[in-house]
A protein has these predicted regions:
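Short, charged phosphate-coordinating catalytic segments
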Residues: 89-100, 165-189, 301
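Conserved tyrosine-mediated DNA breakage-rejoining catalytic core shared by Y-recombinases
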Residues: 178-224
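Basic, Lys/Arg- and aromatic-enriched nucleic-acid-binding interface segment
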Residues: 78, 102-173, 177
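Active-site/catalytic core of tyrosine-dependent DNA strand-transfer enzymes
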Residues: 131-132, 213-276
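Catalytic-site neighborhood detector that most strongly recognizes the C-terminal catalytic loop/helix
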Residues: 199-201, 307-346
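Short, low-complexity, charged amphipathic interaction modules
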Residues: 345-369
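Short, basic (Lys/Arg/His-rich) helix/loop patches that form interaction surfaces
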Residues: 142-151, 231, 261-305, 309
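N-terminal core-binding DNA-recognition domain of tyrosine recombinases/integrases
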Residues: 5-19, 29-120, 141-148
């Protein structure tokens, strides 16, 4: 049943939950590693075996050289046990294990396996002044001459994606990869995106819809690294690079996430000279979006809804747009960067000039003279 569950995650609905299957695969491998592949026959399993597995993950086991090996973090143990609990519940729903004591508990109870709670991660973020500095690096292409040939171009693209994640309401790269120039984009005069968060799309319908106002700095980035707008075309097609299977898409997204973190980290260290503790990732973008808007005095309801957090509304998008019309969204998201009007206008002018041909630029110069 466990393997069957993994199969369905990987293949149902064109494999759109492929990435979810990875934790179930790892959990099953861990169970077999510590208890042995043939230790459990059929449904002959109880709280004793599950507790033994947890103890092995917690304390490790002696290896061939006598050293302790196999210890994993409490958070990973929690992930594996929750995967096992899901499979146990599937078995019960199919009529199996009904006469076996339910082994799991979310708190420490005698004779039951307690599942560690996920630790609250320290929320790391960059201040809006730091994002503004990175944005100026992007606009001016201020990269070290000492970098190897071709690296600056790759780093520039990665920095653009990183900034786009921040300015696009802190969405993750899986959402960026699926972002399209859909009807809503054209209906708003190319001033906003509408998309469904991949993480919550399976659990809700309207609640996962997110509107992204395209403020001017975001447009500057799009002009530089995004695809030319075409109806239903991908905004950032290079992330998937044409692959269609969810397995390959998941792999491509993970690779691009790694590239972005490595390259943006190098930019942070080599250009503004920030400390080695700063290693920005997509998670930083999400935390930074929420933190910087909150510090700028933007109301929490807007922040939550613009990040796709669940609400009780039956039609979240319409309520959201009634409460926060596009102009107000533009105003709020403009607080994400510390740009004055003059620098914003300069960036807009640079963006427009970059689209002109050499002949058009020459005509402008002649007129100026």
């Amino acid at each position: 049943i466990w393997r069957e569950y993994i199969y369905h995650l990987q293949h149902d609905d064109n494999g759109k939950r492929y990435s979810t299957s990875e934790s179930y695969i790892s959990a099953l491998k861990s169970l077999q590693k510590f208890l042995g592949k043939d230790a459990i026959k059929g449904f002959n399993i109880s709280v004793v075996e599950i507790q033994k597995w947890k103890d092995c993950m917690t304390n490790g086991v002696k290896g061939k050289d006598g050293n302790i090996e196999g210890q994993i973090s409490e958070s990973t143990i929690g992930i594996y046990l929750r995967s096992c609990r899901t499979i146990w519940n599937v078995c019960r729903s199919q009529g199996y294990l009904l006469d076996v004591t339910y082994p799991f508990s979310n708190k420490k109870e005698k004779h039951l396996v307690s599942i560690p709670r996920s630790k609250v991660k320290k929320k790391v973020y960059l201040k809006r002044e730091q994002f503004t500095e990175l944005y100026n690096v992007f606009v001016n292409k201020n990269y070290p001459d000492t970098w190897k040939k071709g690296y600056a171009e790759r780093a520039h693209y990665s920095l653009g994606l990183f900034l786009a994640q921040y300015l696009c309401n802190g969405f993750n790269l899986a959402d960026a990869a699926r972002l399209q120039y859909n009807d809503y984009y054209f209906q708003t005069g190319k001033r906003a995106f509408l998309f469904n968060r991949k993480k919550t799309a399976d659990r809700s319908s309207n609640d996962s819809e997110v509107v992204i106002p395209i403020i001017e700095p975001l447009q500057v980035i799009l002009d530089e690294i995004a695809a030319t707008p075409s109806r239903d075309g991908y905004v950032f097609p290079e992330i998937f690079n044409g692959v269609t299977s969810e397995k390959e898409r998941s792999k491509r997204t993970a690779e691009e996430n790694s590239n972005i973190q490595d390259r943006v980290t190098k930019i942070c260290h080599d250009v503004p000279g920030w400390g080695k503790a700063i290693r920005p990732s997509g998670t930083w973008c999400r935390h930074s979006f929420a933190t910087n808007l909150r510090n700028a005095g933007v109301e929490k309801t807007y922040i939550d809804e613009s990040m796709g957090h669940s609400t009780n509304s039956n039609d979240m998008t319409n309520v959201y747009l009634d409460t926060y019309p596009l102009e107000m969204q533009m105003e709020y998201n403009s607080k994400l960067l510390a740009l004055d009007d003059e620098s914003t206008q300069r960036d807009e002018l640079i963006s427009k000039l970059s689209k002109l041909s050499n002949q058009e630029l020459l005509q402008l110069l002649n007129k100026a003279v």
